[in-house]
Amino acid sequence: MWIEKYRPRTLDEVVDQRDSVDGIRALLKTPATIPHLLFSGPPGTGKSTMALCIARQLMGESFRRLVLELNASDERGIGVVRERIKGFSQVIQTAPSGVQFGLVILDECDEMTRDAQTALRRIMETSSRTCRFILICNYQSGIIEPIQSRCSIFRFRQLEKREAIAYLKSICKAENVSADQDVLERVFEFSGGDLRRAINALQVAATSSKAGKLELAQLSKIAPEDESDSVRTMLLAAVQGNFLKARDQMYELMGKRGISGREIIRTANREVVKLAELDSRKQVEAVRLLGEYDFRLSQGANEDIQLSAMLAQISLLGSK
């Protein structure tokens, strides 16, 4: 897969994120005293890649033996995490760089419950002599304060369009794929700033391209045109009291076009403040509603039911 083939392996290769890279370099000047780290920011901005680059620099050839990668949302509970870290900490050996600890990379920490995070804090305390932690999350606000206070925090921002497209161009060159600027811009826009998603889309499109030439027409299925107009039409119907029309538009977006519920809400969040039919107070209330239903979907609620309920509430809001 291209995302692994072209994943940066050193800090020099990391795309954008100069502030974070410079901060990490400063810490790595004294590797034996490096603190626990917390990386937060949107998906596909290089958090996991940065963690692995740090691990390679610290552990060298002992990388696989002295680094434990865990995904908080995949594990069966904090008890499993505790036992794996306990077993890992008991076999720590000195790395070539002189560090005398292992590195635990724990992804999606903001998906853990507060109770699980409290238990994780205790694990970090009891394992501090033999382990350093790199915690990765999308939202820093989802991490309890006692953990944040024990970490050096690095905030990853969305990648600059220019930097991301330059990286996509370098991949195309390496793979002997020709792609014009407008094609790469469409891929970037489709990705929403998620470089991992952009690279995956680029690979799928390149696989189906003819004679190594990537054109806009080939992107229609994997990187469709912006759905802002359709989402705006859906919102307008709801605001004007036509709930059934709004729901039909929602079903078309989800069923026929394959747009996820959370993608619809993200687009709606941009578009609802542009509706002249809602005064500023109602726009604020609509944004609050969108946030509430986005959270419900993030917790695994049914998309059809939640988006229908959201449109019903927006319809009621428009009639006030």
Where are these regions (language model features)?
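Helix-rich C-terminal "collar"/helical-bundle subdomain used as an assembly and partner-interaction module
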Residues: 233-320
